[in-house]
């Protein structure tokens, strides 16, 4: 008997991007609250930078997985 079984659904690998996306969203919202209460907008900008970098790197990984590993279709 084979110990390998195919699943009817796609099992994803572990990824740091959901965690960094959540951190970026939390930082953005915290920065907006800080900015709306008459403070500077540095935390808001930091959150946006984290979110933009996360989105870029996450889609880079999706593109690589689809191109080199055949895991995603376009």
Curated annotation (Swiss-Prot):
Keyword list, A-Z: Membrane, Mitochondrion, Mitochondrion inner membrane, Translocase, Transmembrane, Transmembrane helix
Q: Tell me its EC number(s), please.
A: 7.1.1.9
One function term, GO molecular function aspect: cytochrome-c oxidase activity
The answer, when asked if Membrane is one of the entry's keywords, is yes
Q: Which reaction does it catalyse?
A: 4 Fe(II)-[cytochrome c] + O2 + 8 H(+)(in) = 4 Fe(III)-[cytochrome c] + 2 H2O + 4 H(+)(out)
Transmembrane feature ranges = 15-37, 42-59
- Localization: Mitochondrion inner membrane
Asked whether the UniProt record includes Transmembrane among its keywords, one would answer yes
Q: Please tell me where this protein is predominantly located.
A: mitochondrion
One Pfam annotation reads: COX3
Lipid bilayer topology: Multi-pass membrane protein
Recorded GO cellular component terms are: mitochondrial inner membrane
InterPro entries attached to this UniProt entry: Cyt_c/ubiquinol_Oxase_su3, Cyt_c_oxidase-like_su3, Cyt_c_oxidase_su3-like_sf
- Class of enzymatic activity (EC top level): translocase
- PROSITE patterns per the record? COX3 (PS50253)
One Gene Ontology BP term is: mitochondrial electron transport, cytochrome c to oxygen
Q: How does it assemble?
A: Component of the cytochrome c oxidase (complex IV, CIV), a multisubunit enzyme composed of a catalytic core of 3 subunits and several supernumerary subunits. The complex exists as a monomer or a dimer and forms supercomplexes (SCs) in the inner mitochondrial membrane with ubiquinol-cytochrome c oxidoreductase (cytochrome b-c1 complex, complex III, CIII).
Q: Which family does it belong to?
A: Belongs to the cytochrome c oxidase subunit 3 family.
The protein's job, in short, is: Component of the cytochrome c oxidase, the last enzyme in the mitochondrial electron transport chain which drives oxidative phosphorylation. The respiratory chain contains 3 multisubunit complexes succinate dehydrogenase (complex II, CII), ubiquinol-cytochrome c oxidoreductase (cytochrome b-c1 complex, complex III, CIII) and cytochrome c oxidase (complex IV, CIV), that cooperate to transfer electrons derived from NADH and succinate to molecular oxygen, creating an electrochemical gradient over the inner membrane that drives transmembrane transport and the ATP synthase.
Name of the protein this chain belongs to? Cytochrome c oxidase subunit 3
- What organism does the UniProt record list as the source? Drosophila simulans
| Gene for this chain | mt:CoIII
């Amino acid at each position: 008997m084979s110990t390998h079984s195919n699943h009817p659904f796609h099992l994803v690998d572990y990824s740091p991007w959901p965690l960094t996306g959540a951190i970026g969203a939390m930082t953005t919202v915290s920065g907006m609250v800080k900015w709306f209460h008459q403070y500077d907008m540095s935390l808001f900008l930091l959150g946006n930078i984290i979110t933009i970098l996360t989105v870029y790197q996450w889609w880079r990984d999706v593109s690589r997985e689809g191109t080199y590993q055949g895991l995603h279709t376009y």
